[in-house]
Amino acid sequence: MKVAVSGFKGRMGHEVVKTILREEDLELVAVLDHEPKEKNIREIVEFSSLDVPVYGDLSEMLEEIKPDCVVDFTIPKVGYSNTKTILEHSVRAVVGTTGFTPEQISELKSIAESKKIGALIAPNFAVGAVLMMQFAQKAAKYFPNVEIIELHHDNKLDAPSGTAVKTAEMMAETREFVKQGAADEVELIEGARGGEYEGMRIHSVRLPGLVAHQEVIFGAEGQGLTIRHDSYDRISFMSGVALSVRKTKELETLIYGLENILD
């Protein structure tokens, strides 16, 4: 399968490149970066033995290289437009960029179905994180009092994380609506109680040294339950990325969430 990587100079994109190179059934055919200085990836010392073109224009790459799939790990402000461009060129997409609205996901799904091509957008590609979300969804049925704390490196641009939003969406499907906190509570500092989604509070932490972490804290009379997942290294996401690339061959629609392709 011929794979191109968009955002290859980012931390996740860099790890994706190394993963594609390790997989025998996947071939790295192009990489993309915003205003690249290089014309070929071999100009980067780490990849000096390779011969893979570097592009700065997504449409140009799609038309010249015609990859089977593009893996996109860029930034929220271009994630939607990149994915739309990829799908409109009838190319499969695996997207780890976050910040999509429900309306954007719906539109992209319609494009994928009209082209009969597979695509996947996932807030998190770590299998452990997917299990964490599923466990939280099940627990929310019995513990409606819940708050989410997500912790990431301080270069992350969006808050809350896509994983936190997806977790809240999944819990809302099983959870009785409860507006978390006292009815007359007052924030002495604006934002102290975090963001709100369907009555649940979501808190975002950004610190150097972190990668990606989340805990879902449930409370009830006389007891508490905490479900936590930690990614200490970006390698934790790569098995999910490789699985998703292969899975797009079997799909004729866009799937949102890695949990929807796991057996």
Swiss-Prot record:
Q: Which residues form the active site?
A: 152 (proton donor/acceptor), 156 (proton donor)
> Which reaction is the catalytic activity of this chain?
(S)-2,3,4,5-tetrahydrodipicolinate + NAD(+) + H2O = (2S,4S)-4-hydroxy-2,3,4,5-tetrahydrodipicolinate + NADH + H(+); (S)-2,3,4,5-tetrahydrodipicolinate + NADP(+) + H2O = (2S,4S)-4-hydroxy-2,3,4,5-tetrahydrodipicolinate + NADPH + H(+)
Task: Please provide, alphabetically and separated by semicolons, the GO molecular function terms listed in this UniProt record.
Answer: 4-hydroxy-tetrahydrodipicolinate reductase; NAD binding; NADP binding; oxidoreductase activity, acting on CH or CH2 groups, NAD or NADP as acceptor
Q: Where in the cell is it found?
A: Cytoplasm
What are its GO cellular component terms?
cytosol
Per its UniProt entry, which superkingdom is the organism in?
Bacteria
User: Pathway, per Swiss-Prot/TrEMBL?
Assistant: Amino-acid biosynthesis; L-lysine biosynthesis via DAP pathway; (S)-tetrahydrodipicolinate from L-aspartate: step 4/4
Set out the biological process GO terms recorded for this chain's protein.
diaminopimelate biosynthetic process; lysine biosynthetic process via diaminopimelate
| PROSITE patterns tied to this protein | DAPB (PS01298)
Q: What class of enzyme is it?
A: oxidoreductase
Where, by residue number, does NAD(+) bind?
7-12, 96-98, 122-125
Per UniProt, the keywords (alphabetical) are:
Amino-acid biosynthesis, Cytoplasm, Diaminopimelate biosynthesis, Lysine biosynthesis, NAD, NADP, Oxidoreductase
- EC number assigned by the record: 1.17.1.8
Tell me which Pfam families the record gives. Answer: DapB_C (PF05173), DapB_N (PF01113)
Protein residues bound to (S)-2,3,4,5-tetrahydrodipicolinate: 153, 162-163
Looking up InterPro entries in the UniProt record yields: DapB_C (IPR022663), DapB_N (IPR000846), DapB_N_CS (IPR022664), DHDPR_bac (IPR023940), NAD(P)-bd_dom_sf (IPR036291)
Family that this chain belongs to: Belongs to the DapB family.
* The protein's role, per its UniProt record: Catalyzes the conversion of 4-hydroxy-tetrahydrodipicolinate (HTPA) to tetrahydrodipicolinate.
Q: State the protein's name.
A: 4-hydroxy-tetrahydrodipicolinate reductase
Protein's organism: Listeria innocua serovar 6a (strain ATCC BAA-680 / CLIP 11262)
